[in-house]
Amino acid sequence: MPAITLEMPSIGHRRHDDQRTARLHAVREGDLGSVHSWELVTAVDGPGTRLTYFLSGCTLRCLYCQNPDTWRLPDGIPTTLGEVTDRIDHYAAVLKATHGGVTLSGGEPLLQHTFAGRIFRHCQSIGLHTALDTSGYLGARVDDAFLDDVNLVLLDVKSGLPETYKKVTGRELAPTLAFGRRLAERGTPMWIRYVLVPDLTDAVDNIEAVADYVQSLQSLGDGDAVKRVEILPFHQMGTSKWKAIGEPYPLENTKPPSKKLLERVRGQFRARELTVF
């Protein structure tokens, strides 16, 4: 039998393993996250001026995604909680002066829910408004303590019909609907967002299903969780990003919705006495 040599790992390998262990621990504790980018915007991702962080990673593959470069968690920039909170503190005075705050978007921020929760906790500790921009697909991952630190949810409802939702995202509709109901029962304020894509999400029965769902949310909790519905017209501004990541863009030849179509869809929501933008 040949001799078996039990060699001690080299110092370099040991150091690498220690660093990897420390990194994984930091991720689990929410001390380290993967960030795609950040920006200061006004009246887009919530009220007032917002410091919006786009976290990397998403479980959906929406056909109309304008940020496909956020899909992969490893592609983001490793960012410490301290780096994020330092920037928040730097802009806090401006954000407060405009009645704005901090928004976490993506990607899907709930894929990094521990990191996101730590950020929201810091915001609340210094009196800043918080908003979560999410599909709601991973809503079951977060507990009530997480939601206690969220002042507004921008809930992206991609479709009202399961088959259309599956076609658009590659996933199931039910988790999003359940998360919306949970928010409504808690009384968490919501802006419902709906991306209108001709020949994909514009069918009358699909819009009716979304509108019925949103109306049903108003019968839960305090009856006033949904503050507005935003109809977002499809656009082609994300085309270059699809090309940059080497993915064929399935909606390359799709045109934005006409004014007539936009008004028809807005009218379907207004018919249920919902505030529509």
What feature does the model see in each segment?
Residues 27-28, 44-47, 96, 146-147:
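Solvent-exposed alpha-helices and their adjacent loops that cap or buttress functional pockets
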Residues 78, 170-173, 256-259:
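Short, conserved loop/turn and helix-capping segments at secondary-structure boundaries
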Residues 37-79:
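Canonical Radical SAM [4Fe-4S] cluster-binding loop centered on the CxxxCxxC motif
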Residues 24-31, 71-89:
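Non-heme iron-sulfur electron-transfer modules
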Residues 85, 89-101, 105-106, 110-243:
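Conserved AdoMet/S-adenosylmethionine-binding subsite of the radical SAM
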Residues 69-73, 166-172, 246-254:
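Short glycine-enriched, charge-decorated loop/helix-capping segments at active-site entrances
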Residues 1-42, 198-277:
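Auxiliary Fe-S-binding modules of radical SAM enzymes
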